[in-house]
Amino acid sequence: MTKTLTQHLETIKREGKGIFLPYIMAGDHEKGLAGLPETIAFLENLGVSAIEIGLPFSDPVADGPVIEEAGLRSLGHHTSAKSLIASLQKLDTQLPLIIMTYFNPIFQYGLKDFIKDLARTPVKGLIIPDLPYEHRDFILPLLEDSDIALVPLVSLTTGLERQQELIKEAEGFIYAVAINGVTGKSGSYRNDLDQHLSKLHDIAEIPVLTGFGVSTLEDVDRFNQVSDGVIVGSKIVKALHEKDASIAAFIQEAAAYKK
Protein backbone atom coordinates (compact mmCIF):
# COMPACT_ATOMS: atom_id res chain seq x y z
CA MET A 1 0.00 0.00 0.00
CA THR A 2 1.39 3.37 -1.03
CA LYS A 3 1.72 5.69 1.96
CA THR A 4 -0.32 8.90 2.16
CA LEU A 5 2.82 11.08 2.20
CA THR A 6 4.02 9.58 -1.09
CA GLN A 7 0.62 10.11 -2.72
CA HIS A 8 0.33 13.68 -1.41
CA LEU A 9 3.74 14.76 -2.70
CA GLU A 10 3.27 12.95 -6.02
CA THR A 11 0.04 14.89 -6.54
CA ILE A 12 1.86 18.21 -6.02
CA LYS A 13 4.56 17.07 -8.45
CA ARG A 14 1.99 16.10 -11.11
CA GLU A 15 0.40 19.54 -10.79
CA GLY A 16 3.70 21.08 -11.92
CA LYS A 17 4.49 22.64 -8.57
CA GLY A 18 7.68 22.57 -6.55
CA ILE A 19 7.34 20.77 -3.23
CA PHE A 20 8.18 22.99 -0.25
CA LEU A 21 8.75 21.62 3.23
CA PRO A 22 9.52 23.99 6.10
CA TYR A 23 11.23 22.60 9.19
CA ILE A 24 10.30 23.76 12.68
CA MET A 25 11.47 22.66 16.11
CA ALA A 26 8.67 21.38 18.34
CA GLY A 27 8.50 23.36 21.58
CA ASP A 28 10.69 26.23 20.34
CA HIS A 29 8.01 28.80 21.05
CA GLU A 30 7.46 31.17 23.95
CA LYS A 31 4.43 29.00 24.82
CA GLY A 32 6.37 25.75 24.38
CA LEU A 33 4.33 22.98 22.75
CA ALA A 34 1.17 25.00 23.35
CA GLY A 35 2.37 27.25 20.51
CA LEU A 36 2.73 24.40 18.00
CA PRO A 37 -0.82 24.57 16.56
CA GLU A 38 -0.35 28.31 15.97
CA THR A 39 2.92 27.75 14.05
CA ILE A 40 1.45 24.92 11.98
CA ALA A 41 -1.62 27.01 11.09
CA PHE A 42 0.68 29.90 10.09
CA LEU A 43 2.65 27.65 7.72
CA GLU A 44 -0.44 25.90 6.37
CA ASN A 45 -2.00 29.26 5.47
CA LEU A 46 1.13 30.15 3.48
CA GLY A 47 0.62 27.14 1.21
CA VAL A 48 3.43 24.78 2.24
CA SER A 49 3.31 21.18 0.98
CA ALA A 50 3.88 19.46 4.33
CA ILE A 51 5.71 20.29 7.57
CA GLU A 52 8.80 18.71 9.07
CA ILE A 53 8.85 18.89 12.87
CA GLY A 54 11.97 18.35 14.92
CA LEU A 55 11.82 16.42 18.19
CA PRO A 56 14.77 17.74 20.22
CA PHE A 57 17.65 15.59 21.41
CA SER A 58 20.61 16.60 23.57
CA ASP A 59 23.23 15.29 21.09
CA PRO A 60 21.95 16.29 17.63
CA VAL A 61 24.80 15.19 15.33
CA ALA A 62 23.19 16.43 12.08
CA ASP A 63 22.02 19.81 13.37
CA GLY A 64 23.81 23.08 12.77
CA PRO A 65 23.98 25.80 15.44
CA VAL A 66 20.58 27.39 14.71
CA ILE A 67 18.64 24.15 15.06
CA GLU A 68 20.81 22.91 17.91
CA GLU A 69 20.04 26.09 19.87
CA ALA A 70 16.34 25.71 19.04
CA GLY A 71 16.50 22.18 20.39
CA LEU A 72 18.04 23.41 23.64
CA ARG A 73 15.30 26.03 23.99
CA SER A 74 12.72 23.33 23.36
CA LEU A 75 14.26 21.02 25.96
CA GLY A 76 14.17 23.99 28.32
CA HIS A 77 10.40 23.97 27.77
CA HIS A 78 10.42 20.27 28.75
CA THR A 79 9.55 18.99 25.28
CA SER A 80 9.69 15.21 25.11
CA ALA A 81 8.53 12.50 22.73
CA LYS A 82 5.54 11.80 24.97
CA SER A 83 4.51 15.45 25.29
CA LEU A 84 4.94 16.08 21.55
CA ILE A 85 2.87 13.05 20.56
CA ALA A 86 0.17 14.02 23.06
CA SER A 87 0.09 17.50 21.50
CA LEU A 88 -0.03 16.12 17.95
CA GLN A 89 -2.90 13.79 18.82
CA LYS A 90 -5.04 16.86 19.54
CA LEU A 91 -3.92 18.75 16.44
CA ASP A 92 -6.33 19.58 13.61
CA THR A 93 -4.48 19.95 10.31
CA GLN A 94 -4.99 18.83 6.72
CA LEU A 95 -1.25 18.71 6.04
CA PRO A 96 0.89 15.61 6.44
CA LEU A 97 3.53 16.09 9.14
CA ILE A 98 6.99 14.54 9.23
CA ILE A 99 8.92 13.98 12.45
CA MET A 100 12.70 14.33 12.37
CA THR A 101 14.49 12.99 15.41
CA TYR A 102 17.31 10.75 16.52
CA PHE A 103 17.12 7.08 17.40
CA ASN A 104 17.74 7.55 21.13
CA PRO A 105 14.44 9.35 21.97
CA ILE A 106 12.53 6.69 20.04
CA PHE A 107 14.42 3.88 21.79
CA GLN A 108 13.81 5.46 25.20
CA TYR A 109 10.10 5.75 24.43
CA GLY A 110 9.93 2.15 23.23
CA LEU A 111 9.99 1.43 19.51
CA LYS A 112 6.59 -0.27 19.27
CA ASP A 113 4.84 2.24 21.51
CA PHE A 114 6.40 5.18 19.67
CA ILE A 115 5.11 4.02 16.28
CA LYS A 116 1.73 2.96 17.70
CA ASP A 117 1.18 6.34 19.38
CA LEU A 118 2.57 8.32 16.43
CA ALA A 119 0.11 6.55 14.13
CA ARG A 120 -2.72 8.27 16.03
CA THR A 121 -1.48 11.70 14.93
CA PRO A 122 -1.34 13.54 11.56
CA VAL A 123 2.30 12.39 11.21
CA LYS A 124 2.87 10.59 7.90
CA GLY A 125 6.67 10.53 7.75
CA LEU A 126 9.65 9.79 9.99
CA ILE A 127 13.28 10.86 9.48
CA ILE A 128 16.00 9.38 11.71
CA PRO A 129 19.36 10.82 10.56
CA ASP A 130 21.51 8.63 12.81
CA LEU A 131 19.81 5.34 11.91
CA PRO A 132 22.16 3.46 9.52
CA TYR A 133 20.57 1.82 6.51
CA GLU A 134 21.76 -1.55 7.81
CA HIS A 135 19.74 -1.04 11.00
CA ARG A 136 16.52 0.17 9.38
CA ASP A 137 14.86 -3.14 10.23
CA PHE A 138 14.62 -1.90 13.81
CA ILE A 139 11.89 0.41 12.53
CA LEU A 140 10.58 -0.74 9.13
CA PRO A 141 8.62 -3.82 10.30
CA LEU A 142 6.83 -1.63 12.85
CA LEU A 143 5.77 0.76 10.09
CA GLU A 144 4.33 -1.90 7.77
CA ASP A 145 0.81 -1.68 9.16
CA SER A 146 0.93 2.09 9.66
CA ASP A 147 0.60 5.02 7.26
CA ILE A 148 4.00 6.39 8.28
CA ALA A 149 6.86 6.46 5.76
CA LEU A 150 10.50 6.07 6.79
CA VAL A 151 12.29 8.75 4.75
CA PRO A 152 15.85 7.89 3.62
CA LEU A 153 18.65 10.47 3.56
CA VAL A 154 21.10 10.33 0.66
CA SER A 155 24.34 12.31 0.96
CA LEU A 156 26.66 13.67 -1.71
CA THR A 157 29.27 11.07 -0.87
CA THR A 158 26.88 8.19 -1.56
CA GLY A 159 27.86 6.21 -4.66
CA LEU A 160 25.31 5.21 -7.30
CA GLU A 161 25.07 1.58 -6.20
CA ARG A 162 24.58 2.63 -2.60
CA GLN A 163 22.00 5.24 -3.66
CA GLN A 164 19.98 2.57 -5.43
CA GLU A 165 20.10 0.44 -2.29
CA LEU A 166 19.04 3.33 -0.04
CA ILE A 167 16.07 4.33 -2.15
CA LYS A 168 14.83 0.86 -3.04
CA GLU A 169 11.19 0.53 -1.99
CA ALA A 170 11.42 3.90 -0.19
CA GLU A 171 8.23 5.75 0.69
CA GLY A 172 7.42 9.42 1.29
CA PHE A 173 10.35 11.13 -0.39
CA ILE A 174 14.11 10.95 -0.79
CA TYR A 175 15.91 13.50 1.40
CA ALA A 176 18.88 14.62 -0.70
CA VAL A 177 21.54 16.21 1.51
CA ALA A 178 23.00 19.17 -0.40
CA ILE A 179 26.13 19.66 1.70
CA ASN A 180 28.64 17.51 3.52
CA GLY A 181 28.04 18.77 7.02
CA VAL A 182 25.29 19.91 9.33
CA THR A 183 22.06 21.79 8.66
CA GLY A 184 22.15 25.52 7.99
CA LYS A 185 25.60 25.58 6.39
CA SER A 186 24.70 27.53 3.25
CA GLY A 187 26.84 28.82 0.40
CA SER A 188 29.26 25.89 0.32
CA TYR A 189 27.82 23.62 -2.36
CA ARG A 190 30.05 21.26 -4.31
CA ASN A 191 30.56 21.97 -8.01
CA ASP A 192 29.00 18.65 -9.00
CA LEU A 193 25.92 19.05 -6.79
CA ASP A 194 23.43 19.67 -9.59
CA GLN A 195 24.73 16.67 -11.52
CA HIS A 196 24.50 14.53 -8.38
CA LEU A 197 20.89 15.60 -7.75
CA SER A 198 19.87 15.06 -11.38
CA LYS A 199 21.21 11.50 -11.33
CA LEU A 200 19.46 10.77 -8.06
CA HIS A 201 16.24 12.23 -9.45
CA ASP A 202 16.53 10.04 -12.54
CA ILE A 203 16.72 6.79 -10.58
CA ALA A 204 14.20 7.64 -7.85
CA GLU A 205 10.61 6.45 -8.14
CA ILE A 206 9.32 8.92 -5.54
CA PRO A 207 9.93 12.67 -5.10
CA VAL A 208 13.46 13.88 -4.32
CA LEU A 209 13.69 16.91 -2.02
CA THR A 210 16.89 18.86 -1.44
CA GLY A 211 17.77 20.03 2.05
CA PHE A 212 20.63 21.22 4.31
CA GLY A 213 21.83 24.75 3.57
CA VAL A 214 18.85 25.83 1.44
CA SER A 215 18.14 29.42 2.45
CA THR A 216 17.39 31.73 -0.50
CA LEU A 217 14.83 31.98 -3.29
CA GLU A 218 17.75 31.43 -5.66
CA ASP A 219 18.38 28.10 -3.93
CA VAL A 220 14.70 27.24 -4.24
CA ASP A 221 14.78 27.92 -7.98
CA ARG A 222 18.08 26.10 -8.51
CA PHE A 223 17.12 22.92 -6.69
CA ASN A 224 13.66 22.78 -8.23
CA GLN A 225 15.45 22.42 -11.58
CA VAL A 226 17.23 19.22 -10.53
CA SER A 227 14.91 17.77 -7.88
CA ASP A 228 11.23 17.92 -6.97
CA GLY A 229 11.49 20.56 -4.27
CA VAL A 230 13.28 21.77 -1.17
CA ILE A 231 13.36 21.62 2.61
CA VAL A 232 14.23 24.82 4.48
CA GLY A 233 15.05 24.61 8.16
CA SER A 234 17.56 26.94 9.79
CA LYS A 235 16.33 30.08 8.02
CA ILE A 236 12.75 29.46 9.17
CA VAL A 237 13.67 28.38 12.71
CA LYS A 238 15.79 31.52 13.16
CA ALA A 239 13.10 33.83 11.75
CA LEU A 240 10.34 32.35 13.90
CA HIS A 241 12.48 32.67 17.02
CA GLU A 242 13.35 36.29 16.21
CA LYS A 243 9.75 37.07 15.17
CA ASP A 244 11.00 38.21 11.76
CA ALA A 245 7.76 38.89 9.87
CA SER A 246 9.54 38.92 6.50
CA ILE A 247 9.79 35.12 6.60
CA ALA A 248 6.12 34.89 5.59
CA ALA A 249 6.80 36.39 2.15
CA PHE A 250 9.75 34.04 1.61
CA ILE A 251 7.73 30.96 2.55
CA GLN A 252 4.74 32.00 0.46
CA GLU A 253 6.86 32.59 -2.65
CA ALA A 254 8.87 29.40 -2.19
CA ALA A 255 5.69 27.38 -1.61
CA ALA A 256 4.07 28.78 -4.77
CA TYR A 257 6.98 27.77 -7.04
CA LYS A 258 5.83 26.53 -10.44
CA LYS A 259 7.95 24.21 -12.55
UniProtKB/Swiss-Prot annotation:
Organism: Streptococcus sanguinis (strain SK36)
Quaternary organization: Tetramer of two alpha and two beta chains.
PROSITE patterns named among the record's database cross-references: TRP_SYNTHASE_ALPHA
Catalytic activity: (1S,2R)-1-C-(indol-3-yl)glycerol 3-phosphate + L-serine = D-glyceraldehyde 3-phosphate + L-tryptophan + H2O
Described function: The alpha subunit is responsible for the aldol cleavage of indoleglycerol phosphate to indole and glyceraldehyde 3-phosphate.
Protein name per Swiss-Prot or TrEMBL: Tryptophan synthase alpha chain
Enzyme class: lyase
Sequence similarity: Belongs to the TrpA family.
Annotated metabolic or biological route of this protein: Amino-acid biosynthesis; L-tryptophan biosynthesis; L-tryptophan from chorismate: step 5/5
Database matches in InterPro entries: Aldolase_TIM, RibuloseP-bd_barrel, Trp_synthase_alpha_AS, Trp_synthase_suA
GO cellular component: cytosol
Single GO MF annotation: tryptophan synthase activity
Swiss-Prot/TrEMBL keywords: Amino-acid biosynthesis, Aromatic amino acid biosynthesis, Lyase, Tryptophan biosynthesis
Assigned EC number: 4.2.1.20
Keyword Cell inner membrane: no
